[in-house]
Amino acid sequence: MMLFLGILFIVGIDVGLNTTIPKLLMAKTGMSVSEAGLGSSLYFSARTIGSFVGAFLLARIASDRFMQYSMGIAIVGFILLLVVDSLLWISILVVVVGLTCSNVFSIIFSYALQHLPERDNEISALMIMGVSGGALITPLMGVLSDALGQVAGLSLLLLCLLYLGWISFRLQKRK
């Protein structure tokens, strides 16, 4: 269940950032909708690059340690993203969060399959069901944003990142 929630939360982070980065850019920098939409492209470009770089790094670094470092950097970067107002810093932090979150799905999925290899079909199906995280987290973000503001909605993603950071240490203990 812990890993299922991890998949749910990492997908929720991806979808949540995809929908809110443009709003964040418009609110903090005064960008137009068409300009701010490029923020999502920046995030997913960083994720793509991070996936390729991660493939090489994961061949040399233990995946639990890699995830711990990634989540630590992602959490710090995301907290800074909530408080900075500069277009340059927002852009840099969007890239940092994209790079550091890029390999989390595959690490969690791999650990889940290794946990009970004799039940890999069931485990795989459960993990893929976690992809619904984008459909669950984003509406909750919307409710929080409407009630308390943009930063409150984004704070839900911070809670997701904190959970992922916590499970990165739990994965190390399972070995």
What are these regions (language model features)?
Residues 50-63, 145-146:
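Helix-to-loop junctions at the C-terminal end of transmembrane segments
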Residues 88-96:
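Paired small-residue
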Residues 65-80, 158:
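Structural signature of the two symmetry-related core transmembrane helices
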Residues 102-117:
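Intracellular juxtamembrane helix-capping segments at the cytosolic ends
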Residues 1-41, 48-51:
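Extracytoplasmic gate region of multi-pass secondary transporters
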Residues 33-37, 117-127, 154:
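Loop-to-transmembrane helix entry/capping segments in MFS-fold secondary transporters
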Residues 140-161:
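A membrane-interface helix-boundary motif in multi-pass transporters
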Residues 158-175:
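Multi-pass alpha-helical transporter architecture, strongest
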